[in-house]
Structure formats: C-alpha cells, structure tokens
C-alpha cells in the first residue's frame, strides 16, 4: 500500500502556486500536502510595512490555496518546535520547503533538517527563490565572485529552468490541524493610518504579479535600457515586492524577458542583467555573511561616522524635509506608495552616508 502520510509544505517567501518546486514535488507524490506558515522570530523582526505586506500576501495566498481544495495552516513559535508539533498531530513524515540564504535562515533550516532526519523523517529543501544557487557559481580558482560583471559573464549563457505549472489540485489530508486566525496576528497593527495610504499602490498576489509581468514585457521593456534610470518615467517592472515574497519567481521573469529578447527587443537583456544583480546580491550575502553587519571594506571601520539617528539632520532625512528636493521627493514616494525607484534609492542612501556621514547601519 502506498505511503499516504502527509507532507508538511513549510512556506516562507514562496507565496505562489506556479513555478513552486517544493509544492510541485509534494503534489507529485500523491500524498496529502499541508501548507503551513510559521510566525517565528524572523517574522517578528520585520518592520511595520513588510509585516503588513506579509499579512496581505498570506491572506491572498490562503484564498489561492482554497481554490485548489487546500488550506493555509498558521502557527506561531520556533520553527523546529512548531514542525515537531504538526508532525505529532498529523502523522506527517516529511517536510518540504524552499531555500532561503541569509545566515539566520540557513542556521534555522539546517537545524530543522538535522532534527527531522535524525528522527527518521524526510526533509527536503528546494530552489525557486534564485535562478543560480550561490554554490553553483564559482571563479576559475573555485572562489566566489566579488564583482558583478564577471558574475554576469559566468551565468549569462547558462540554462535557466523553465517555470513549473501550478498544480491542478493539492491533495488534502482527511483532517486539518488547528490553525491560528490570521487576524489575531495583527501583522498590520504598527502601520496604523499608513496602511490606508499605501494600500492603493500594492500589487497583491500571484495573478497580479504575472499580469504586471505580461504588461511590462508587452510594452515598457522595449525602452527599459533608456528609461529605467529616470525616476519620473514608468520604465521599471515594479515587481520587487512580489519577488521579495515569492508571489512571482525570477525564472518566470527571466523567461518572459528572454522571449522578448528572441523577438528582437534588445533592451530585454538589460532587464535580465538587473535580475542577475539580484542573484549577485544573494551570492555575496551567502559567501560573505558579515556584509549584513560589517563594512565591506575594513578601512571604513575607523571612520568617524555619525551613529546618532536622532540628530535634526537625520530626522529631516527620514521625514523628507532636507530641503534637497530630489531626496525629499524620494522619501515621500516611499511613504505614500511603499516603493522607491532604484535610482532614487541610490541618491537617498548617498545623501545619508556621504553627505550626512551617517553610518549605513
């Protein structure tokens, strides 16, 4: 008799149905799949806006799961403890998840995998958040890349996996485990009135992200190389929030751009290069995790930075009241729309660090 013990699908930054390798593999077994999202310390450490946006994404993804006869189980606590509880409650014998790459997530996931396998359970991690796993791209001497252009040259000719289709259905367990009600988590509480301001600009969920990608490839990508650095022009994809939560995959974006490139849209390659900048950032973080807490160049460690965020100058920067029109407009853009144009981010950060001499931390 085939194994019918459930598989726990541990969700994090992969709130989509299509091109979801972990979900695809779980459904392919024919066994019941229990999608679960855990509110642990990594979630609680998020700022007000990301936490609010996560809440919106979870609510929307729960509806998507319901459309395929599934549910989203919500639990709170340390991931290893919550997963152990769910295994005990459901009789699950496997945990599948999509890999993350920051040091905290790596340590957590490694501990979960070691514990699960030590108990005789199946524990499998899958790609999907990146096109090129950080350990698969190396210099000729076997080291990591530290400069973007050689990194781009190393990956530009590689085959990128074709996006996987969404499952037609998700096998459900006979009995669902207890779940928290999302509203009790109050993920948007700290946003207060800001939620009403930003909400109209949110591109929420997988369907909206895919629609925007199609719209972008059908139009703006043709002038992406010329318009992407002009903050006043609608020349970017606007998909950062969806990529961050995994409501769309980089593979989907890559292949849409590649199709445009094959149709003669030369500037599509510029967009593909920007997708690889994202890959490069993860590559650096994975191989040099100290970047999250230390200067890239040690010679800046003894620079007399201003580390007091309460100074009038820094507060004016935060509030968009520096008197420098571009900087202030960029900050207001972020507060109103939840986004800031890439070129504006560079200028705003430069003003803070190079003009006000404030430490980036």
Predicted regions, residues:
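Trp/Phe/Arg-rich N-terminal binding region typifying the photolyase-homology
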Residues: 1-163, 267, 332-333
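Short, flexible loop/turn elements at secondary-structure junctions
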Residues: 13-15, 101, 127-130, 152, ...
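Short, hydrophobic/aromatic alpha-helical segments in well-folded domains
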Residues: 22, 212, 238-239, 253-256, ...
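Secondary-structure transition/capping motifs at alpha-helix termini
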Residues: 118, 260-264, 337-340, 358-359
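Glycine/tryptophan-enriched, flexible segments
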Residues: 121, 142-300
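C-terminal substrate/ligand-recognition segments
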Residues: 282, 287, 313-358
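Helix-loop-helix junctions that connect adjacent transmembrane helices in secondary transporters/permeases
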Residues: 290-323
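Active/binding-pocket-proximal capping segment
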Residues: 292, 298-303, 346-361
């Amino acid at each position: 008799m085939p194994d019918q013990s459930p598989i726990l699908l541990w969700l994090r930054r992969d709130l989509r149905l299509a091109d979801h390798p972990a979900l695809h593999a779980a459904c392919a077994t024919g066994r019941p799949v229990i999608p679960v999202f855990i509110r642990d310390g990594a979630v609680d450490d998020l700022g007000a806006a990301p936490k609010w946006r996560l809440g919106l994404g979870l609510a929307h993804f729960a509806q998507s799961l319901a459309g395929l006869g599934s549910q989203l189980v919500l639990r709170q606590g340390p991931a290893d403890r919550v997963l152990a509880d769910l295994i005990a409650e459901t009789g699950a014998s496997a945990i599948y998840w999509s890999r993350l790459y920051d040091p905290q997530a790596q340590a957590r996931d490694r501990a979960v995998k070691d514990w699960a396998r030590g108990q005789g359970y199946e524990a499998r991690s899958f790609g999907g958040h990146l096109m090129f796993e950080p350990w698969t791209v190396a210099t000729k001497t076997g080291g990591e890349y530290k400069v973007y252009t050689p990194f781009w040259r190393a990956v530009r000719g590689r085959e990128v996996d074709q996006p996987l289709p969404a499952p037609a259905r998700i096998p459900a367990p006979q009995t669902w485990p207890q779940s928290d009600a999302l509203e009790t988590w109050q993920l948007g509480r700290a946003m207060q009135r800001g939620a009403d301001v930003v909400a109209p600009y949110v591109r929420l969920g997988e369907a909206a992200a895919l629609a925007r990608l199609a719209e972008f490839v059908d139009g703006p990508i043709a002038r992406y190389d010329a318009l992407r650095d002009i903050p006043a022009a609608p020349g970017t994809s606007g998909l950062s929030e969806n990529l961050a939560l995994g409501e769309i995959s980089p593979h989907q974006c890559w292949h849409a751009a590649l199709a445009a490139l094959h149709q003669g849209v030369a500037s599509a390659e510029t967009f593909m290069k920007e997708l690889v900048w994202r890959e490069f950032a993860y590559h650096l973080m994975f191989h040099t995790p100290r970047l999250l807490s230390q200067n890239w160049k040690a010679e800046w460690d003894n620079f007399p930075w201003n580390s007091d965020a309460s100074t009038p100058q820094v507060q004016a920067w935060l509030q968009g009241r520096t008197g420098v029109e571009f900087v202030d407009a960029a900050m207001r853009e972020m507060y109103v729309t939840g986004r800031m144009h890439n070129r504006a981010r560079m200028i705003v950060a430069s003003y803070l660090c190079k003009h006000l001499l404030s430490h980036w931390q």
